[in-house]
């Protein structure tokens, strides 16, 4: 009965796709309430007219929604909060970083807290058995790292391999061989995978879940592992005659998987010569390598022998011919590996790199961001002052504009960093805007990389804006990027100050200093000197001079609050001069006169401009004693302006006889010191002759 019903239904379906004529059309008109078409199908005639036909039924394909599709839709309706720090930090004023150093410290603290929580959960799993998450979240539940199978069997070996217990897996394998048990080829290959991936060493983790009652042998092994960490800064190296080689030699039967695993492990741990020799053995046994093994062999060919470029390039081409002979289709990583290796040869590899790029497009492989990153770095020559080789970035951006990318290569997150670096070296702001627009397209922002890459990208981008853009646009970018996107370095703030100077917008300087303090640049001497120099260089309206004086007082407090051992060397004469001048111009004369004591205390020479303004201030207040103090300061450092200041005191102030004698003595001392210095210079000249 079911078969008959199915046949009738198929017959009805086949008739629905044919034009309705005659009796069947009339039948359809009698039953207009019946819908045998999907919602997307339409009638060819309006109801009430002669129906000449119906479009074929189109059943829409099922749409599979992501579990977080609703959250993604909601997230697309809002933009980044430009007034807040990055989202990774908690919404707590005590946990919000104010500088790049604090952000790194907070991220490390957050990761440390996660590791501690995982350690507690996995150390005491019996207290965390209640699963309150709906749906189930596996990473929140305890993980069991200790083997449950105690007997000597192949199942126990498989369990230890799955738990990534390197030493325990090797011990179990040896016990099986001693017991006369034959281990299957599949299990042995899995053990080789484990050994080759970790270089025959226990995998390093941020936390270790060891039982408190571990044996002495295991404790000694952990001590040995900790001692080796100092020598493994740049990764684990392949040791000769290690367990992987020993087990590989003991295998009675080896297949392609066995050879490929060993070759990839040797290349990963920088045993390039051994990998190439093992590939020769694979060919002698008439076996074939897979595409991932060929990718590793390409890297080994470039890194193994110190040969010329032509010889290494010919060997790479030979490996590619082997791939064709073995009917192995290259993938994206094959071409990216070639391009990455070609970067070692700089100018010589440019033409082959373009050939590789054309070849991968010809066989239908879409380049990834890492592909273009390697091309950019290959054509970018830091020693070329004209940057002629960097112009390839324009062709790359014309090809990439508007595209959305998905992760395909581990080096994909380096593209935007290298592209913005080229924009900065070319001083091309329009190109930088194109790169930034590509970053904001779709989910491309995820490829900006880790924290240090993001800081590098945005610092280069904003520095170029400060150099090339109008000041109003620059300030808008400043509000948009800082601190929500990244925390600026002190040099970035200096570039912004220079942009304000060019645009004659010095009234923004007090705000820049306030922001600099929040970002942890209070004790950056180069930044403080730049701010003081810009404020004290010219005279400004009274209200602006008052704001500048307040800023100068704040900087003076910063100098005084730093460690005592740094105070003397961090009080440059330029800063003392600028602070005193700013105090004078704002009418804060008492604070300005107090600055004179700092010149003597730190043995710093005042500038003539400051001494003249101090003399003007003394004249306004009609204070001969202050005027004489200025002369004394100039005389103490034997400045040439001392004589001119003395004449001004004699002509502009009413002084008594005692003050005249003091001035005469100061002038005499200055003359004697000038004579001594001139005689010393003459004697030095004669000796030189």
Swiss-Prot record:
Its main location: mitochondrion. Gene3D superfamilies: Tetratricopeptide repeat domain. Residues 665-689 are annotated as: Disordered. GO terms for molecular function: ribosomal small subunit binding; RNA binding; rRNA binding. PROSITE patterns: PPR (PS51375). The keyword rRNA-binding applies. InterPro entries: Pentatricopeptide_rpt, PTCD3, Rib_mS39_PPR, TPR-like_helical_dom_sf. Abundant in testes, skeletal muscle and heart tissue. PPR repeats lie at residues 149-183, 184-219, 255-289, 290-330, 331-367, 368-409, 412-446, 454-488, 489-523, 572-606. It comes from the Eukaryota. One of its GO terms (biological process) is mitochondrial translation. It is found in: Mitochondrion. The modification N6-acetyllysine is found at residue 126. Residues 673-689 have a biased composition (Acidic residues). One of its GO terms (cellular component) is mitochondrial matrix. The keyword DNA repair does not apply. Mitochondrial RNA-binding protein that has a role in mitochondrial translation. It is linked to Combined oxidative phosphorylation deficiency 51: An autosomal recessive, mitochondrial disorder characterized by intrauterine growth retardation, low birth weight, poor overall growth, progressive limb rigidity, delayed psychomotor development, hearing loss, and optic atrophy. Brain imaging shows abnormal bilateral signs at the basal ganglia and brainstem. Patient cells show decreased mitochondrial complex I and IV levels and activities, and generalized mitochondrial translation defects. Belongs to the mitochondrion-specific ribosomal protein mS39 family. Component of the mitochondrial small ribosomal subunit (mt-SSU). Mature mammalian 55S mitochondrial ribosomes consist of a small (28S) and a large (39S) subunit. The 28S small subunit contains a 12S ribosomal RNA (12S mt-rRNA) and 30 different proteins. The 39S large subunit contains a 16S rRNA (16S mt-rRNA), a copy of mitochondrial valine transfer RNA (mt-tRNA(Val)), which plays an integral structural role, and 52 different proteins. Associated with the 12S mitochondrial rRNA (12S mt-rRNA). This is Small ribosomal subunit protein mS39.
């Amino acid at each position: 009965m079911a078969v008959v019903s199915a046949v009738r239904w198929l017959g009805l379906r086949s008739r629905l796709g044919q034009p309705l004529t005659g009796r069947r059309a009339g039948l359809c008109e009698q039953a207009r309430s019946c819908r045998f078409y999907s919602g997307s199908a339409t009638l060819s005639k309006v109801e009430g007219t002669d129906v000449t036909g119906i479009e074929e039924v189109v059943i829409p394909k099922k749409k599979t929604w992501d579990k977080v599709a609703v959250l993604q839709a909601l997230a697309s309706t809002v933009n980044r909060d430009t007034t807040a720090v990055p989202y990774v930090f908690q919404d707590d004023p005590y946990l919000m970083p104010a500088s790049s150093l604090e952000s790194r410290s907070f991220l490390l603290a957050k990761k440390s807290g996660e590791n501690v929580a995982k350690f507690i959960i996995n150390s005491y799993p019996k207290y965390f058995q209640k699963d309150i998450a709906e749906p189930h979240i596996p990473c929140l539940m305890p993980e069991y790292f200790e083997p449950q199978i105690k007997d000597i069997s192949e199942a126990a070996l498989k369990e230890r391999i799955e738990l990534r217990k390197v030493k325990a897996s090797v011990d179990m394998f040896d016990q099986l061989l001693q017991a006369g048990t034959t281990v299957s080829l599949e299990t042995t290959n899995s053990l080789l995978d484990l050994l080759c991936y970790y270089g025959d060493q226990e995998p390093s983790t941020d936390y270790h879940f060891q039982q408190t009652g571990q044996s002495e042998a295991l404790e000694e092994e952990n001590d040995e592992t900790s001692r080796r960490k100092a020598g493994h800064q740049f990764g684990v190296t392949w040791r000769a005659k290690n367990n992987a080689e020993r087990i590989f030699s003991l295998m009675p039967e080896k297949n392609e998987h066995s050879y490929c695993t060993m070759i990839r492990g040797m290349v990963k741990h920088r045993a390039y010569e051994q990998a190439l020799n093992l590939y020769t053995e694979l060919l002698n046994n008439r076996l074939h390598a897979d595409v991932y093994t060929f990718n590793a062999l390409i890297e080994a060919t470039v890194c193994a022998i110190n040969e010329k470029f032509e010889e290494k390039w010919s060997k790479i081409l030979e490996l590619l011919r082997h791939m064709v002979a073995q009917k192995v289709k290259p993938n994206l990583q094959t071409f990216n590996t070639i391009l990455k290796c070609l970067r070692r040869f700089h100018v010589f590899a440019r033409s082959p790199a373009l050939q590789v790029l054309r070849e991968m497009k010809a066989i239908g492989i879409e380049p990834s961001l890492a592909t273009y990153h390697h091309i950019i770095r290959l054509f970018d020559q830091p020693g070329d002052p004209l940057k002629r080789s960097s112009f390839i970035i324009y062709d790359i951006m014309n090809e990439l504009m508007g595209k959305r990318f998905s992760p395909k290569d581990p080096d994909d997150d380096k593209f935007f960093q290298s592209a913005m670096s080229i924009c900065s070296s070319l001083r091309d702001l329009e190109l930088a805007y194109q790169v930034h627009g590509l970053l904001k397209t779709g989910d491309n922002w995820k490829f900006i990389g880790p924290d240090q890459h993001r800081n590098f990208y945005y610092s280069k981008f904003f520095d170029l804006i400060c150099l090339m853009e109008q000041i109003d646009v620059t300030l808008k970018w400043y509000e948009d990027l800082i601190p929500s996107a990244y925390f600026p370095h002190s040099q970035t703030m200096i570039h912004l100050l220079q942009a304000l100077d060019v645009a004659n917008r010095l009234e923004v300087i007090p705000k820049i200093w306030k922001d600099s303090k929040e970002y942890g640049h209070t004790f950056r001497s180069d930044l403080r000197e730049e701010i003081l120099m810009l404020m004290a260089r010219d005279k400004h309206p009274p209200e602006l001079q008052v704001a500048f004086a307040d800023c100068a007082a704040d900087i003076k407090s910063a100098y005084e609050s730093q460690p005592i051992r740094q105070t003397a060397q961090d009080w440059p004469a330029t800063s003392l001069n600028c602070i005193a001048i700013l105090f004078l111009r704002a009418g804060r004369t008492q604070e300005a006169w107090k600055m004179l004591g700092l010149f003597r205390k730190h043995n710093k020479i005042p500038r003539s401009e400051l001494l003249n303004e101090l003399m003007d201030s003394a004249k306004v207040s009609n204070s001969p004693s202050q005027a004489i103090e200025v002369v004394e300061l100039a005389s103490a450092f034997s400045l040439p302006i001392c004589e001119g200041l003395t004449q001004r005191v004699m002509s502009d102030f009413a002084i008594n006889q005692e003050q005249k004698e003091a001035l005469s003595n100061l002038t005499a001392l200055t003359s004697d010191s000038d004579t001594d210095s001139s005689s010393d210079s003459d004697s030095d000249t004669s000796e030189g002759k």
